[in-house]
UniProtKB/Swiss-Prot annotation:
Subcellular location(s) of the protein: Cytoplasm
Keyword entries, A-Z: Cytoplasm, Fatty acid biosynthesis, Fatty acid metabolism, Lipid biosynthesis, Lipid metabolism, Phosphopantetheine, Phosphoprotein
Domain of life: Bacteria
Biological process per Gene Ontology, one example term: lipid A biosynthetic process
GO molecular function per UniProt: acyl binding; acyl carrier activity
Function noted in UniProt: Carrier of the growing fatty acid chain in fatty acid biosynthesis.
Pfam families noted in UniProt: PP-binding (PF00550)
Residue numbers of O-(pantetheine 4'-phosphoryl)serine PTMs: 37
Family membership noted in the UniProt record: Belongs to the acyl carrier protein (ACP) family.
Upper lineage: Bacteria, Pseudomonadati, Pseudomonadota, Gammaproteobacteria, Enterobacterales
The name this protein goes by in its record: Acyl carrier protein
Gene behind this protein: acpP
PTM entry text: 4'-phosphopantetheine is transferred from CoA to a specific serine of apo-ACP by AcpS. This modification is essential for activity because fatty acids are bound in thioester linkage to the sulfhydryl of the prosthetic group.
Length: 80
């Protein structure tokens, strides 16, 4: 099974059509990767589906970079 970081970057690649080598952990979805608000909602939904978790609106607002999404998923997986 791929690790969390690879899986998240694959989702970003698929949703935002950005080359994977351009997706850095400190990249902001909006400022660096060009996502708009609809894109970020779709990213959150894709994360929920991929990792079989629920992300509240409050949590989703805090997930605004690649690294924050990795950290969040790692914490959620530890609680399972």
């Amino acid at each position: 099974m791929k690790n969390i970081e690879e899986r998240i970057k694959k989702i970003i690649f698929e949703k935002l059509d950005i080359k994977q080598e351009k997706i850095f952990n400190d990249a902001s979805f909006i400022d660096d990767l060009g996502a708009d608000s609809l894109d970020t909602v779709e990213l959150i939904m894709a994360l929920e589906e991929e990792f079989d978790i629920e992300i509240s609106d409050e949590e989703a607002e805090k997930i605004n970079t690649v690294q924050k999404s990795i950290d969040f998923i790692q914490k959620k997986n530890l609680k399972k």
